[in-house]
């Protein structure tokens, strides 16, 4: 597959799965042995774990809209720079919801093999938006 093909797989996953919350076709995008990478650790969560992740995020932000700002490819890897808007409706990592819209940016790094996402990691810039909403209090 080409870099362009790999970008399309990630873009379609964002449009068809993450932005809608409809996980019925997630198997078309995510491999059986799908791995999430966080804090330098690898977690093989498979399709079931990916479904739980998507539904969990959409519970917190039910109107989530992820917009791709740019994508870069290198071999099997796709880097996606994105922005997100969504209403903060449920508690998240111990933070109380505000019921207000929030906007933040982030970067995802996905590895594609045999036409499916096999590995995912990334980082989201949530500190400033959460401070602006009073969810995270900055020390004076």
Predicted segments, located by residue:
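C-terminal and inter-domain tail/linker signature
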Residues: 1-140
């Amino acid at each position: 597959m080409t870099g362009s093909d790999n970008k399309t797989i990630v873009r379609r996953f964002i449009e068809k799965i993450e932005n809608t919350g409809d996980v019925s076709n997630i198997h078309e995008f995510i491999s059986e042995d799908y791995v999430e990478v966080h804090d330098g650790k690898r977690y093989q969560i498979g399709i079931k774990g990916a479904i739980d992740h998507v539904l969990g995020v959409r519970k917190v932000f039910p109107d989530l809209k992820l917009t791709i700002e740019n994508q870069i490819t290198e071999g099997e890897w796709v880097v996606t720079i994105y922005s997100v808007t969504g209403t903060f409706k449920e508690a998240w990592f111990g933070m109380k919801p505000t019921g207000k819209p929030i906007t933040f940016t982030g970067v995802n790094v996905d590895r594609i093999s045999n036409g499916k996402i096999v590995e995912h990691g990334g980082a989201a810039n949530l500190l400033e938006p959460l401070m602006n909403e009073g969810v995270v209090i900055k020390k004076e």
